Amino acid sequence: MKKYVLDLKVVSVEALSDKHVLIKLTDEKPLPEILPGQFVEVRVDHSPTTMLRRPISINFVDRENNQLWLLVAMVGDGTRQLGQLKEGDVLNCMLPLGNGFTMPTGKSQKYLLVGGGVGVAPLLYFGKLIKDFGAEVTFLLGARKDTDLLELDEFAKIGKVCITTEDGSAGEVGFVTNHSVLENEKFDMISTCGPKPMMVSVARFAKKAGVECEVSLENKMACGVGACLCCVEKTTEGNQCVCKDGPVINIKKLTWEI
């Protein structure tokens, strides 16, 4: 796919928690084609410690309003600076990058999208496209506590939402792989994004259940185009750059011990 470097205008910055913001961006021209699971590399201005662009998952593409949504966890100088953006500011973005999730091929297919923490970000757009295609989508979202759950109202507009929290403050207590939906329902595809230990557990469940599974890897990235080799992941096809060959990879290609 063709890549673009665009100066996108900030429409709004909404605080979703004390450490997460939702940034909505727009452009004068229609946004380019974007696949679910792809990401952007954003340039962070006014941060003396942030020389490299920051990779951010594409949370949603609102074609009706020509908006691109980015869900940002403010964990360092660069992302905290992004949280200070205001309406009318300009954010330089390189996009779309990487490969996306596999779309359903039949309307009878049932997809389970599993997200943990800010890893829920790419699942919103993916779920919307699955719904628009006519297939069935269920979300399984996990967090440490209820205040860490993000965009629940948006997910509920698309499909069934199942929740786990480690402290039991919302949904079922425990990790996502402990949720009863995994015992009570059958799925044709599981797609997941979040902390690696969570994705390993989800991949292990999928392999045991004989269900196709894709994971969206969150390796440390710099260039975003496969040049610097800092995001390399070992696969059955050799070392691959997560930014270029991923971030979405079928678990059959991974060398994880599952």
Question: What is each stretch, according to the model?
Answer:
Residues 45-47, 96, 236:
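Short, surface-exposed secondary-structure boundary micro-motifs
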Residues 2-87:
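Ferredoxin-reductase
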Residues 4, 239-258:
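Short, basic/aromatic-enriched C-terminal tail that caps enzymatic domains
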